[in-house]
Structures are given as structure tokens and as C-alpha cells.
Amino acid sequence: MKPAKQTTASLAFLAMGIVYGDIGTSPLYAFKEVFFSHHPLAINPDNVLGILSLVFWAFVLIVSIKYLLLVTRADQNGEGGILTLSAIAQQSAPKPWQRIAMLLGILATGFFFGEAVITPAMSVLSAVEGIAVAQPDLAPYVLPIAMMIIVALFAVQAMGTERIGRFFAPVMLLWFLVLALLGAHAIWHAPQVLRALNPAYAVHFVLLYGQHTLFILGLVVLSVTGVEALYADMGHFGIKPIRIAWFALVMPSLLLNYFGQGAYLLTLSAPTGSTFFSLAPKAWLWPLILLATFATVIASQAVISGIFSLARQAINYGYLPPMKIAHTSEHSQGQIYVPAANMLLFVAVIFVMLRFRSSANLAAAYGIAVTAIMMISSLLLVLVARYQWQWRWPRVVTIGIVFIGMDSLLLASTSTKLMEGGWLPLLLGCVVFIVMYIWQQQRQRLLEIAGNELSVSAMIQSLEEESFQRAAGTAVYLSRSLNHVPRSLLHNIKYNKTLHERNVLMTFQYEAVPRVHPCRRAEIEQVSASFWQVVIHIGYQEEPDMAQVMHCCGLKGLYLHPNETLFLLSSERLKVQKLGMWHDLKVWFFIQMSKHALRTSERLNIPPDRLIEMGVYREM
């Protein structure tokens, strides 16, 4: 039992460096924005205790109960994430709800990208702004320094972060201990802030401000940004270590710091705007700024890695066109680099920093995408609870009312900042949603067109009855589906008048599981004397590789010798069939994405000297 405990403890330690980076750096700006934003709340005991009570119960209800106890129950072989939750809902829900679950998953993915643009800018700026607290003369240099850090962060992505990644957990452990120490020291001088643990203070605050509470709740949301990382990174560490890290260290440290900032406001007659950095003695200020900068870089890295992982998931689910994906580690499958996503995210982050220029201005843009994702996760959770877990309606309705009601309130509160910057992540999210929706819809249409063509069995029977010249070796034809005759096969017969001794119709089927066991990788059926049908199963966290595929086929008895196997692919050129402006625009956009998508031969790592590509035209 002891080794198991050590393993769980070490995973909990590592989880601090990845999972809790975003939510762990929220004390830098969340509390400050309530009392020192463009629309500050008056500093008095009722307001301070009310806000602290709201933060505490947000941690309990949203993070601890909703995510760590409920949402994380919905997993596929231990993997989590919003697309996983959407996939589980689609598997079990009635047909009308399946498409809704798919669209909700795509929409949440778009909002995650919108949030990912704000997070690095907000986190790094809020840390570097500590320089202006230590040395006010350096205030004009805050933005350039923050931008230099962001440029360096995105520049190293191509090299991978495996070497420096080992320092993430120790740095974040030190960060959380410092948070706790600073907060506890301040609470010692004003222990009355601990009364905010009583929910009566939150209720009193809401009753006191009435409808104006919505505006203030939008700032309280900043304390739980990054909560979706708990679910998304579940596959890397397991839910038990993530829960241990939260309840044993992360949550107590964050609450101590927030309550310490509240104590600071109540004990000083003229508190300054930077409530976090003001907790530290002057001698600690520069080391604290340096530590905060490291912590925000780690938080930003976790978000960037999350975007790479989500992009790969979306590609394998068929929601995004194939892109180049590079593996940056020989030891970890999760260490990947997606150049296109990296460049788009970098440009967007730099634009946001230049547009908003400070964490105070960015606070208005931060939060609305987070609450939108929370709302979607609650809607999907209700579907999963009813149809996957088979919960009875009274239980489902209860969690629906509690969490959808709570998320609706938070979404409404962040919507009050829509015109001050909240439009930006929503706009980015909607753009990503439209791209994914058009790609998925038109790709599905192509599969339907292919399925309506000549049947595979009839075609094979016809070919076996004909007397074609036979070429030596094996020809592999890639097919969209089992019922689809590859265009490359038809063109080879039409123009070359030849067949190979062995012909393999190969289909790649992406499964709603993170990884497929090697024993289940290949399904092989010999359908005639010289034809085989092969289905290759790929998980959404995997990258297809033809060398591995050939090895798996060999294990099942179909030997594909590299020097005797030829791969014949059809390179489609799509044409628009004029049916109306909206239809034509969608098809045109799909065609443009197809032109710039990663070629099948490149994605599968097919050797160029064993490849023949044939151009074909298809009308949509």
C-alpha cells in the first residue's frame, strides 16, 4: 500500500504545476478588481465580508462540488474535458439531444479559445504590474516587459517544455505556500474576517445590493477562472491526486490569501490598489514579483498546452481540419506542439495586450467565456446524469436547478461587462465555433455523398470477375468509410487498367476514447481472393502513423512489407454547386480550409517514394 500512497502523493504534487496554475494566480487580480476597478466597491466591513463569503462559497459550490465531485465522474478511460463530456452526452442521449450536445461541445471549445487568449495576457500583466508597486518610476515599462515574456513563452513552444516542466510543480508549491503565509500573517491582525465563512454574510450582501449584485458577481468570477482545467487535465494525473492537491493545499492557500487581502483592507485607513503585493513586507517585494511572474508563466503554459491538446482532440473528432502536430517529447504522448494554433494564439494575445494595456482593463474581458463554459458544462452534465448515469428525474432536476441557476446568475453578471471588453472572448469563441461547425457539417456531407455511391461489395465482385493485368505487390487505398469505394481505386482501373496482386481498402475510424489498445487497433477482413478491408481504430489523443498501422496489420496476419506496398490516394478538388448565397459561402469556406489542411499522406507519415496521388474533382 505504501508505494501506491507515494505515487498518489507525487501525482498530487505534479498536478499543482499544471492543473492549478490559472486558478492559483487569481489572487493577483481578483480581489483588487472588486475594490479598485473602474467601478470600485466601497471599503467597509459589510462589503469586504460579503465578497469574501461569496468567494468562499464559490470555491465550495463550483470547484469542490460541481467540478471535483460531479463533473469529473464523467470520464472516458480516465480522460476528461469539455469535448469528452459532449461525446459522453452524445453516446447516451436521445437522438434530438445528440446534435445539441455536439453543438454545445463545439461552442464551449470556441469559448475556451477565447478564454485562452485572455489568460496569458491577464496573468503576466498582473504579475509584472508589481514592478510599479515596488518602483513607481518603472510603470511605463510594465507592458513592454510583459510582452517580452509572452514572446519568449510562445517562441519556446516548438522546442517543448519537458526540461523546464520538471520545475513547474516545485515553483507552484512555493507559490501556494507563500500565498498561505502572506494571508495568514494578515489574518492574524484582523481575525474578524473569518466570520465570512458564514453564508449569512453572502446572503446579506446580495440583499443589500439587489440587482447591482450582478455587476459585482462578475468580478467574483475572476476567483474561479481556470476551474475547467481540473476536468480537462484529469487524464494526465487521475482525479484522486487532483482532489488531494485541491483540498490539502490549493484551496486552503487561496482562501487564506483572499481572506488576508480582506484583512488588509479592514486594518489600513488608506489601503493602496494592489491588495496582493501590499501583503508583503518591502524586503520581500522584489522576490515576490519574480515568483509571481514565474507562476503566471506556468499558468500561461498550462493554457497553451491545453489549447494544443484540445486542437488535437477536435481534429480527431472531425471538428477541425487536419493540422501539423509535432511531438516534443520522447517520453510523453501529451507533449505536443501545434504550429498553427500556437501562431494564432500568439497573435491574438499580443493584440489583446496592446488593445487593453493593463490587467485592470482586461478584467472586463475576463470571465464571460469562463461562465459560458460553466453553463455549457452544467447543461451537458444534466444530459449525462439522466441518460448515461440513469439518475432519476427528481435528482437530475435538483442538480439542474442548482447548477444551471447558479451558472445563469454568473453568466448574467459577466454580461454586464460586455461593452467594456467582454465582447472580445465571445467574438473569438463564436469565430472558432463557426469554423468548427462548417468543417464538421461539410465533412459529414462529403461522407454522405460517398456513402451514396457504388457499394464496395458489388465493386469488388465486379473487379474479381474481370481479367485485369496484375502488378506485383500490395496496393493500399485509403477509404472514407467501409461503404465507400475509394476514388483512387476507380481511377487506377480507369486509366492504368491494372490491379495489384493484393488490394487493401483501409479506413481510419476515430473512437470516442483517448487511446485504443494495440490489440484492438486493426480489424481485418478478407472479402475476396485479392481484396481486404481494414479498419484502423484511433483514439482522440493519438496520432495515426502508417508504420505503426502496418505493424498492427502484420500482427493480425496481413503482412504489408514497406518495400512492396504502394499507397494510392485521391487528392480531391472540390467545386461549389450554386444553391444559394449562404450555402455557397459555407462550401467556399470549407474548400479554402481543405486546401490549407494537412495532406493525408503527411499526416500518416507515408514515405513519398511509396505514394501515388491522383487528382479528382467532386461537386458539392
Swiss-Prot record:
Entry annotated with the keyword Ion transport: yes
Cellular component terms (Gene Ontology): membrane; plasma membrane
MF terms in GO: potassium ion transmembrane transporter activity; symporter activity
Residue ranges of the TM segments: 11-31, 51-71, 100-120, 138-158, 167-187, 202-222, 246-266, 288-308, 334-354, 364-384, 396-416, 418-438
Pfam families in the cross-refs: K_trans, K_trans_C
Family as reported in the entry's similarity comment: Belongs to the HAK/KUP transporter (TC 2.A.72) family.
HAMAP family the UniProt entry points to: Kup
Protein's GO biological process: potassium ion transport
Protein name: Probable potassium transport system protein Kup
Free-text function comment from the UniProt entry: Transport of potassium into the cell. Likely operates as a K(+):H(+) symporter.
UniProt KW DNA damage keyword: no
Keywords attached to this entry: Cell inner membrane, Cell membrane, Ion transport, Membrane, Potassium, Potassium transport, Symport, Transmembrane, Transmembrane helix, Transport
Membrane topology: Multi-pass membrane protein
Protein localization: Cell inner membrane
